[in-house]
């Protein structure tokens, strides 16, 4: 130990030491620690925006019961607007129902969508942003596509 350090230690024990140097040192360290804590908390993200990752849009299903062939265009418009459509043709005459299904299925194909028969005279037409799971293709093979449209 050098003579200067020994002298400073003795003076410190007696209470005559210069505490200003130590106080300044500890104050600087405390300020540095506060700055570190502040930057850790914010992560240096000034101007950052929080964006929700829940982007799933609620899809509405349109149910239509066309009375005339002209109604088939409004069904196609719904598909073009990316809305699934359930078409109820139970009360339509056979020729009209066949024409509507032909027109809407063509529009569905042109838009990249799909169709599914879900019941007697009831069809589901969906745009390309909707998938249909579960199929009833066995009924189509056995009874034909329009077997339930007879009156």
UniProtKB/Swiss-Prot annotation:
Keyword check for Endoplasmic reticulum: no
**UniProt feature coiled coil, ranges:** none
Q: What does this protein do?
A: Cell division protein that is part of the divisome complex and is recruited early to the Z-ring. Probably stimulates Z-ring formation, perhaps through the cross-linking of FtsZ protofilaments. Its function overlaps with FtsA.
The organism's lineage is:
Bacteria, Bacillati, Bacillota, Clostridia, Eubacteriales
**Protein name per the record:** Cell division protein SepF
Taken from the UniProt entry, a GO cellular component term is: cytoplasm
Q: What does the entry give for GO biological process?
A: division septum assembly; FtsZ-dependent cytokinesis
Cytoplasm in keyword set: yes
């Amino acid at each position: 130990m050098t003579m200067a350090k020994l002298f400073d230690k003795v003076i410190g024990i007696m209470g005559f030491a210069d505490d200003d140097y130590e106080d300044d040192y500890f104050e600087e360290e405390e300020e540095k620690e506060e700055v570190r804590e502040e930057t850790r908390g914010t992560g240096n993200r000034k101007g950052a925006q929080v964006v929700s990752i829940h982007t799933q849009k609620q899809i509405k299903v349109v149910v239509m019961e066309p009375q005339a062939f002209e109604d088939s265009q409004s069904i196609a418009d719904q598909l073009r607007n990316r809305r699934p459509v359930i078409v109820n043709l139970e009360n339509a005459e056979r020729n009209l129902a066949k024409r509507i299904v032909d027109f809407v299925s063509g529009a569905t194909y042109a838009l990249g969508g799909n169709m599914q028969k879900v019941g007697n005279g009831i069809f589901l037409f969906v745009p390309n942003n909707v998938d249909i799971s579960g199929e009833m293709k066995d009924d189509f093979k056995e009874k034909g596509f329009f077997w339930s449209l007879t009156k």
